Amino acid sequence: PRCGWNLEGERDSVVLICSNCETAWEALEGKFNRVRVSKVSGTGGSTVYLPFWKISASGKGLPLHSFADFIRLTNQPRVVRREMENQEMRFWVPAFKIRPKVFLNLSRQFTVSQHNFHPEEMIPKKNLYPVTLPQSEAVQSLKMILAGATLNKKDVLPHLPNVSFDIMDSTLVYLPFTDTGHEMIQQQMRTSINKNSLEFGRRL
């Protein structure tokens, strides 16, 4: 859309890449919208980059305006540091379809432990897993992710019907995984995803 070069992606991709001007585009309502993209650098020749939506959001109906609010609200066993009070609340959501249980587990783990990731604004040159979950569907999952991350369910579940989110920003972030043949292992977190689950997700 910007430079006239062909966009690249697989048949089920909802975000297409222009390798010429290093931009990414999501097709919405018959037109292409630019997507901000970052990556966390990986190491090793067997690195595959899996996409995640990093969504900055503020909650209504519950006190959820910063990462510190999230840690308190979900009762995480972490010390709330002063800098967390000024840190935007960012949900990390798989940008690929996968079984609901795995989807929620990945969202919970990566949202809680997002301090492990230090993205830089660039698109990986190769080994990109396709984006098969649109940003709009990732936004729709935020309530479920909040509920899934909450350790003391009775603190949050009764309020969920009245919860909504203001979306401030979103970025597509490619995280590095090591392909072991049977699993994909996230290089910073050591979280593993069974490759059969990824294959199944391509058929959802």
What residues fall within each predicted segment?
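Long C-terminal interaction/binding lobes of large macromolecular proteins
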Residues: P1-R2, N6-L204
